[in-house]
From Swiss-Prot:
Induction comment from the UniProt entry of this chain: Expression is positively regulated by the azaterrilone A cluster-specific transcription factor tazR.
Lineage, highest ranks first: Eukaryota, Fungi, Dikarya, Ascomycota, Pezizomycotina
Pathway: Secondary metabolite biosynthesis
Protein name according to UniProt: Probable acetyltransferase tazD
Known function: Highly reducing polyketide synthase; part of the gene cluster that mediates the biosynthesis of azaterrilone A and other azaphilones, a class of fungal metabolites characterized by a highly oxygenated pyrano-quinone bicyclic core and exhibiting a broad range of bioactivities. The first step of the pathway begins with the non-reducing polyketide synthase tazA that assembles one acetyl-CoA starter unit, five malonyl-CoA units, and catalyzes a series of Claisen condensations, methylation, PT-mediated cyclization, and finally releases the first hexaketide precursor through the R-domain.
Source organism (scientific name): Aspergillus terreus (strain NIH 2624 / FGSC A1156)
GO MF assignments: transferase activity
Keywords: Transferase
EC id: 2.3.2.-
Top-level taxon: Eukaryota
Family, as annotated: Belongs to the trichothecene O-acetyltransferase family.
């Protein structure tokens, strides 16, 4: 169902089933001041002009308001099963900006900020002057990894224009035309599942069984510990090493993603207890649906939308690294099918039902190294913006999610010719030293298996 103006300036639509499913997962941790799977995306940048913190903050706030006009869904709220957007008055716009754009002191680091983030009814932004970095934080039902980085790009572009005094006149009241529809609306999926959709959904649901008895990392610390903050261990390959990795992957007819995925499997087996290393490894096959959507929904104008999907996929411990990599390559190349797309609504409906029925949690809880990739991040965030003599250079980008479980997530992307490996973990279950060691092993495994080390 499309957006409808229910009162002057108030636009509403039903929450999509995929949004509802992801929101249900995130909301369960609100009682402890956290939000599982909330997304953080950021960029470190420099400007060719020196600005006082006060002036930069003023430019950022102006850019933030203009950014909302271009991507109004960042200011949507949800109550019950309804998503709402209110065209703001000047006072409401100022109040929203003050609530959602946070300027931190020089001593605040991105690592500490992310570990302390709390749920918000809106997408929020954080300026870290000490790192020359901006971070966007959003509930996962609002966007996905690709969309989050596209939003980073859009904000930096708007900021560069604001600094370069290239502002545009904003006609509040017509931004509703850019509100994001749900994936079910974009794919024109029926409310009532057909027999074909039910069968496709059944096949996707079957993959959940692969999580049972799967290998995971050996536990450390207190098994009964409550989750704490989300931290990360990061490793960046040099441009020369990245080029060598890409060439070696091409020679073996596998993608970088498939190679890193096979390395995540190898890392999980290495980090498992010795008596668990013969178990199969199960992880998520994640796909961006954006390339499969009709324009304009396939483009960055609809970055503030949840357009992703996936299913579980196992590989046995008996296979070699290259056998696993080739199996992942085949799966990534064939995973998005007509059946997969047409069951997106019903699959989410079934998962919501499973969660609401309160199925007992798996014992032991999953603890594998899972994987998520945004590929070439330069396709999402430009390394350089120029407006009226103002030059904004992006030094680096980053993407991750909040995790409140024993699972870790390897995020990978390339930017400015470098492969970035970003291991996200909860500090209640992993010591920083172990996480740093794990990401080093991951990179070493990748290079060794490709004949580069």
């Amino acid at each position: 169902m499309p957006w409808i103006e229910t009162k002057p300036g108030l636009w509403q639509r039903p929450i999509g089933d995929n949004e509802k499913f992801i929101k249900f997962i995130g909301d369960r941790s609100h009682q402890v001041g956290r939000e599982h799977w909330s997304v953080t995306a950021g960029a470190a940048f420099t400007l060719n002009r020196d600005w006082s913190l006060s002036d930069l903050s003023s430019h950022c706030l102006n850019a933030w308001c203009a950014f909302r006009f271009d991507h109004p869904s960042i200011a949507c709220t949800v109550e019950g099963d309804t998503v709402s957007y209110q065209t703001p008055s000047n006072e409401e716009l100022a109040s929203w900006a003050n609530e959602t754009f946070h300027i931190h002191d020089l001593s605040t680091t991105s690592d500490d900020l992310i570990a302390a983030l709390k749920p918000s009814r809106y997408l929020t932004a954080h300026l870290l002057p000490g790192e020359n970095r901006v971070i966007l934080h959003a509930a996962h039902w609002r966007t996905d990894g690709y969309g989050a980085l596209q939003l980073v790009h859009a904000f930096l572009d708007t900021l560069c224009k604001a600094v370069g005094c290239h502002s545009k006149a904003i006609q509040w009241g017509e931004e509703w035309r850019r509100l994001t529809p749900s994936i079910e609306e974009v794919l024109d999926l029926p409310l009532t599942a057909t027999p074909e959709i039910l069968e496709a959904t059944k096949e996707c649901l079957k993959t959940l069984a692969h999580t049972r008895g799967a290998v995971g990392t050996a536990p450390s610390g207190d098994k009964l510990a409550a989750p704490a903050g989300t931290r990360s261990a990061h490793l960046s390959l040099t441009t020369a090493d990245t080029s060598a990795v890409m060439a070696a992957c091409a020679e073996r007819k596998i993608s970088l993603l498939s190679a890193v995925h096979a390395s995540c499997a190898a890392l999980t087996w290495l980090e498992a207890s010795s008596n668990d290393r013969d178990k199969h490894y199960t992880s998520t096959m994640r796909f961006s649906l954006r390339p499969h959507l009709p324009p304009p929904y396939s483009g960055p104008a609809y970055a503030a939308g949840l357009y992703t999907g996936g299913y579980m996929f196992p590989v046995p411990a008996s296979q070699s690294w290259i056998e696993n990599a080739k199996q992942y390559e085949k799966e990534y190349n064939t995973g998005i099918t007509e059946d997969f797309l047409k069951c997106r609504r019903q699959y989410a409906v079934e998962l919501i039902g499973i969660l609401q029925r309160g199925a007992p949690p798996p014992d032991p809880p999953p603890s594998e190294v899972d994987i998520s990739s945004v590929g070439d991040a330069e396709a999402l965030v430009s390394p350089r913006f120029t407006h009226n003599g103002t030059i904004l250079e992006v030094q680096s980008v980053d993407i991750g999610v909040e995790t409140l479980t024993r699972q870790t997530y390897c995020f990978l992307w390339t930017f400015r010719g470098r492969l970035e490996l970003h291991l996200v973990y909860n500090e209640a279950f992993y010591e920083p030293e172990r996480a740093e060691r794990m990401v080093r092993i991951l990179a070493k495994t990748l290079q060794t298996e490709l004949g580069l080390a």
